[in-house]
Swiss-Prot record:
<feature type="binding site">
    <location>
        <position position="319"/>
    </location>
    <ligand>
        <name>Mg(2+) 2</name>
    </ligand>
</feature>
<dbReference type="InterPro" id="IPR034151">
    <property type="entry name" value="TOPRIM_DnaG_bac"/>
</dbReference>
<dbReference type="GO" id="GO:0005737">
    <property type="term" value="C:cytoplasm"/>
</dbReference>
<keyword id="KW-0238">DNA-binding</keyword>
<dbReference type="InterPro" id="IPR006295">
    <property type="entry name" value="DNA_primase_DnaG"/>
</dbReference>
<keyword id="KW-0808">Transferase</keyword>
<dbReference type="Pfam" id="PF10410">
    <property type="entry name" value="DnaB_bind"/>
</dbReference>
<keyword id="KW-0862">Zinc</keyword>
<dbReference type="GO" id="GO:0008270">
    <property type="term" value="F:zinc ion binding"/>
</dbReference>
<feature type="binding site">
    <location>
        <position position="317"/>
    </location>
    <ligand>
        <name>Mg(2+) 1</name>
    </ligand>
</feature>
<keyword id="KW-0235">DNA replication</keyword>
<dbReference type="GO" id="GO:0003677">
    <property type="term" value="F:DNA binding"/>
</dbReference>
<keyword id="KW-0460">Magnesium</keyword>
<keyword id="KW-0548">Nucleotidyltransferase</keyword>
<feature type="binding site">
    <location>
        <position position="317"/>
    </location>
    <ligand>
        <name>Mg(2+) 2</name>
    </ligand>
</feature>
<comment type="similarity">
    <text>Belongs to the DnaG primase family.</text>
</comment>
<dbReference type="InterPro" id="IPR019475">
    <property type="entry name" value="DNA_primase_DnaB-bd"/>
</dbReference>
């Protein structure tokens, strides 16, 4: 839908109707402070809230990283989505009539919006159907399973809207398509039915299964998890990916857990649906689960938004598979873990039990579980404990293996204080109770860390571009354009410098962006732009006209690094200009050198001397500009 041309009246109505506090509040825990609202910034990692939302201005700003803008900017940056996608979602949310500039596109837009709304409706009706069927005679086996095997109360069954999918091949199909008259294509897109491979017709995706609705963070049903009640494989089966459901971005139970996570300032991540349900029933409601896939960074960051301390506790099974799952989860979010951006703890329950088994095995286990949560070791301590399992440090091979594992953990710790603490701890462990050996073991580990930190011949620099000059120029132009887009107060300075120095952008996609900026400023008379509408209007210009937006899309998004560049714009502008000025001088120097090679200094002495002087002048300018650039090198 990115090529849809939205009518300016539609965009203006959306801007007038939206409530930025309500929108951002879906993703960030906000607390009222005076006239504004404060929370943890979702665009960079912080422990103290510096993210401010102003309902009066309908703007947000982070004093930590400099991210700021309106509701459009927030949703575009957070979800890495296009302006059109965000505008359409907001229009749907606030029930705003969409106007486009082409009737055919308007029809396609209405079809897309109608389909999404229809999918939500179909999923809600299906959830109600499964839940109702659970209490019918055909659902008795499933209800008995929940009562006797899972020990769940009627209130919990109602709260999670658990249900039963009948054993028939076309039961849900007939209900949704033939009785409720939903289009068969929409029901198929919802992941509830499948087309038969041979012949015609459809059959139900879920049959003779216990059904568990999966909801988004707003509480809308977007998919189903299921457990077989017979011998069918697989034992657990989820909905396929659909327009509503993306497994790697969804956490089961987050809609019901988010308030508790905010209240107790921690989140517990378990393996299965019934672990979540059992813990919620026991009053431990800050619990969610991944959906049978490797944990993703997106899932962890969605949890972090609801906890100011960013404390997450992994409670996977304590068997070998669970230990491996914990290790994989740590690896998946390694940048967050090793840098300390998430306070991760690991809880393994006694006797290898999962949370559901543990809670239901004894009446006292609810209190015991809560105690174990408080005592759960930090992930580093847990990793060290895993290294020591079934190892005899008096055995040279075991000792060497443990020491290597410790070095591997320590070298990834970016916080020097944390590294020093665990370096001492590991030294004490390896000394095996002999205090005289502690300093020796610490020094030994430290020397390996120092050696390991040295870059090799093909070390961390292998990623650098093959053409550093071209790469540097592109970065400089991109930085200047980003400052121009996001810093209205710097635009007169940049305009003046570019005009006085007769500078042009060298890359085609940058020239096109500059052309669109110029057109938008002239059309909308943006000589003064206190609300910084330029980025939004330029993106709209790309959507309404031809142009490769992908090549410049990153310039409209603010990261922690780029926010720092904008904060230091007065230093970054001269640096970028210096690089851009170098290019024509380098070109002129090459021109002079070519002329010198063609001239005979004996017969063409005057011309030879002229180009020799010009070459030297260009060389001096290049040296001056390079020195100016190196004072504030581009990252």
């Amino acid at each position: 839908m990115d090529n849809l041309r939205l009518h300016p009246d539609t965009i203006q109505e959306i801007k007038q109707r939206i409530d930025i506090v309500e929108i951002i509040g879906d993703y960030v825990v906000l607390k009222k402070r005076g006239r504004d609202h404060l929370g943890l910034c979702p665009f960079h990692d912080e422990k103290s809230p510096s993210f401010s939302v102003s309902p009066a201005k309908q703007m947000y700003y982070c004093f930590g990283c400099g991210a700021g803008g309106n509701a459009f900017n927030f949703l575009m940056e957070l979800g890495k989505r296009s302006f059109t996608d965000v505008a359409l979602d907001l229009a749907r949310r606030y029930q705003i009539q969409i106007q486009t500039l082409e009737p055919a596109q308007k029809q396609e837009l209405q079809r897309q919006l109608s389909l999404r709304e229809q999918l939500y409706e179909i999923m809600a009706v299906a959830a109600g159907f499964y839940h109702h069927t659970l209490f019918q005679p055909q659902g008795q086996e499933a209800l008995t399973y929940l009562d006797q095997k899972r020990c769940l109360s009627s209130a919990t069954i109602q709260e999670f809207q658990l249900g039963y999918a009948p054993a028939g091949w076309e039961t849900l199909y007939r209900y949704l398509v033939e009785q409720k008259r939903y289009p068969v294509a929409a029901v198929e897109q919802a992941g509830l039915i499948k087309a038969r491979q041979s012949g015609t017709g459809y059959y139900d995706q879920f049959r003779h299964r216990l059904m568990i609705p999966i909801r988004d963070v707003q509480g809308k049903t977007i998919a189903f998890g299921s457990r077989t009640l017979g011998n069918d494989e697989p034992k657990y089966l989820n909905s396929p990916e659909t327009p509503l459901f993306h497994k790697s971005k969804t956490l089961f139970g987050l809609d019901q857990a988010k308030t508790a996570i905010q209240k107790v300032d921690e989140a517990i991540l378990v393996e299965g649906y019934f672990d979540v349900i059992a813990l919620h029933e026991s009053g431990i409601k800050q619990t969610v689960a991944a959906l049978g896939i490797a944990l993703s960074r997106d899932q962890v960051q969605s949890l972090m938004r609801f906890s100011q301390s960013k404390q997450i506790i992994f409670n996977f099974d304590a068997d070998k598979a669970g230990i491996n799952a914990t290790q994989r989860a740590i690896q998946e979010i390694e940048p967050l873990v090793y840098s300390g951006q998430v306070n991760l703890r690991i809880l393994n329950l006694p006797a290898g039990k999962d949370a559901d088994e543990f809670i239901h095995s004894s009446a006292e286990n609810k209190e015991i579980y809560q105690t174990l949560v408080k005592q759960a070791p930090l992930w580093v301590d847990w990793q060290i404990q895993q290294l020591l399992k079934q190892k005899n440090l008096k055995d040279p091979l075991d000792f060497e293996q443990v020491a290597r594992g410790m070095v591997d953990i320590l070298k990834r710790l970016t916080d020097q204080n944390k590294r020093a603490y665990y370096l001492q701890l590991c030294g004490e462990i390896l000394s095996q109770g002999d205090s005289r050996l502690i300093s020796l073991q610490v020094n030994n580990l430290s020397s390996q860390l120092t050696y390991g930190d040295r870059p090799g011949k093909n070390g961390s620099r292998h990623w650098q571009a093959k053409d550093p000059t071209s790469s540097l120029l592109e970065k400089a132009e991109a930085l200047l354009l980003k400052i121009y887009l996001h810093c209205p107060q710097e635009r007169p300075t940049i305009d003046q410098i570019l005009t006085e120095n007769d500078l042009l952008f060298s890359f085609a996609h940058h020239r096109l962006l500059w052309q669109k900026i110029d057109q938008v400023r002239e059309y909308f008379n943006l000589d003064s732009d206190p609300d910084n509408q330029l980025p939004l209007l330029v993106q709209l210009a790309y959507l309404e006209q031809e142009g490769d937006f992908n090549s410049v899309e990153s310039l409209f998004q603010l990261t922690e690094t780029s926010a720092e560049d904008l904060f230091r714009a007065n230093l970054r502008i001269p640096e970028a200009i210096a690089i851009m000025e170098k290019v024509p001088w380098e070109s002129y120097q090459k021109h002079c050198f070519g002329k010198l090679q063609q001239l005979d200094p004996r017969t063409q002495a005057e011309d030879f001397r002229y180009y020799q002087e010009q070459w030297q002048k260009a060389h001096q300018e290049i040296q001056r500009l390079e020195s100016q650039r190196l004072n504030q090198p581009l990252n």
